[in-house]
């Protein structure tokens, strides 16, 4: 098998346990199935028992399931659960389907679950692993850019509820993460852009130099230059691994990774799961957070314009859908960062420096929300929906 153009090995350190992130390419090709560097060969050392359940979806299964399943069957008893594709299926019904396969196979605590897919599959597989028999091992094989740079690392797992995104879940760290850059070649352009939103997020909250790097390299990333994409994934995983090592369960600094998410989750919940991709909602949410940062006096208008330009360079939306101000405030009022009844937001002190704060005039938040609001007193969606 040819030497990959890009390869990196990282380690995530947590109080639960340490685990590797392997960033590489071409592990799922037909020629790679029998090779030591194949997808199956990479994950096999992290399977403790003899039982394996691969959880994937209807989009990914035809592309990569054979390359993973066929070699593993030589060593392990392998079952597969193929779920529908989409955020709208990130719910208890899908979790029950995973449980059903585990129970029908008479699998026990020796089982290892493998998430083969994007963030939805990873979140549901991880939550199933956290809850089945009070906890079994699982492995992440993220196949989208968003999941490679963010959701597969750090142990956040869960499902949505009709009244809120990620309302039900657990912190449950994987045994390893295998990010194959080649899987991005089959990713729709819209999904690639959604993943780039999370990449841009890291630059905005942690590293202004990385923002400059992205401004120069986003065209190559959009053109699927795997070496450039691999470098971006590596950097993002390094940023996240560092934060997770400091704050595994999001009691402090890890909250900074939610930049744009409070606004973004309002969009996702209001518009219906799946209508806006997570990264698209986060992109529009980051613009709103930047606009509030400007109103406070932390960012200049030129810096906000720069945020918008880099998002547009990635073909991302910079304007949220029209949502009544009170609806948005109701949704934000149930955010997990709310403390003593006050909304706390991740805002930018400068490009590359973020802070969790409630030190802002509520009228300024209302002003930001009003810029794109439905001008109505009430909205049918202004229920007690919860955003996590």
UniProtKB/Swiss-Prot annotation:
One GO cellular component, as annotated: cytoplasm
Protein's name according to its UniProt entry: 3-dehydroquinate synthase
UniProt catalytic activity: 7-phospho-2-dehydro-3-deoxy-D-arabino-heptonate = 3-dehydroquinate + phosphate
CDD domains documented for this protein: DHQS (cd08195)
Cofactor note: Binds 1 divalent metal cation per subunit. Can use either Co(2+) or Zn(2+).
High-level lineage: Bacteria, Pseudomonadati, Pseudomonadota, Gammaproteobacteria, Moraxellales
Binding site for Zn(2+): 198, 261, 278
Organism: Psychrobacter arcticus (strain DSM 17307 / VKM B-2377 / 273-4)
HAMAP family, alphabetized: DHQ_synthase (MF_00110)
NCBIfam families: aroB
GO-annotated biological processes: amino acid biosynthetic process; aromatic amino acid family biosynthetic process; chorismate biosynthetic process
Localization per Swiss-Prot or TrEMBL: Cytoplasm
């Amino acid at each position: 098998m040819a030497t990959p153009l890009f390869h990196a090995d990282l380690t995530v350190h947590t109080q639960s346990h340490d685990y590797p992130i392997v960033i590489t390419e071409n592990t799922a090709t037909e020629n790679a199935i029998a090779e030591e560097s194949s997808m199956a060969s990479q994950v096999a050392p992290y399977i403790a028992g003899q039982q394996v359940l691969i959880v994937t979806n209807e989009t990914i299964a035809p592309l990569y399931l054979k390359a993973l399943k066929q070699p593993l069957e030589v060593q392990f008893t392998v079952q597969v659960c193929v779920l529908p594709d989409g955020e709208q299926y990130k719910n208890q019904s899908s979790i029950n389907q995973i449980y059903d396969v585990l129970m029908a196979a008479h699998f026990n605590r020796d089982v290892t679950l493998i998430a083969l897919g994007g963030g939805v599959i990873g979140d549901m597989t991880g939550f199933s692993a956290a809850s089945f028999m009070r906890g079994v091992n699982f492995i992440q094989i993220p196949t989208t850019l968003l999941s490679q740079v963010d959701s597969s690392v750090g142990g956040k797992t869960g499902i949505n509820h009709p009244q809120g995104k990620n309302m039900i879940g657990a912190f449950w760290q994987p045994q390893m993460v295998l990010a194959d850059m080649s899987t991005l070649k089959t990713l729709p352009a819209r999904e690639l852009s959604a993943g780039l939103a999370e990449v841009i997020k890291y630059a905005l909250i942690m590293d202004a130099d990385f923002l400059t790097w992205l401004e120069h390299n986003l065209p190559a990333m959009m053109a699927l230059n795997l070496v450039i994409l691999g470098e971006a994934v590596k950097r993002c995983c390094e940023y996240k691994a560092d934060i997770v090592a400091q704050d595994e369960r999001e009691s402090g600094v890890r909250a900074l990774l939610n930049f744009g998410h409070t606004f973004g989750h309002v969009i996702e919940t209001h518009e219906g799961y799946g209508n806006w991709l997570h990264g698209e909602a986060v992109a529009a949410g980051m613009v709103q957070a930047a606009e509030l940062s400007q109103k406070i006096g932390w960012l200049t208008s030129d810096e906000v314009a720069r945020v918008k330009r880099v998002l547009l360079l990635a073909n991302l939306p910079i304007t949220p859908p029209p949502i009544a101000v009170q609806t948005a405030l109701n949704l934000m009022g149930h955010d997990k960062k709310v403390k003593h009844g006050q909304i706390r937001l991740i805002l930018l002190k400068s490009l590359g420096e973020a802070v969790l704060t409630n030190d802002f005039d509520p009228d300024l938040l209302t002003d930001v929300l009003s810029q794109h609001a439905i001008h109505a007193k009430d909205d049918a969606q202004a229920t007690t929906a919860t955003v996590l």
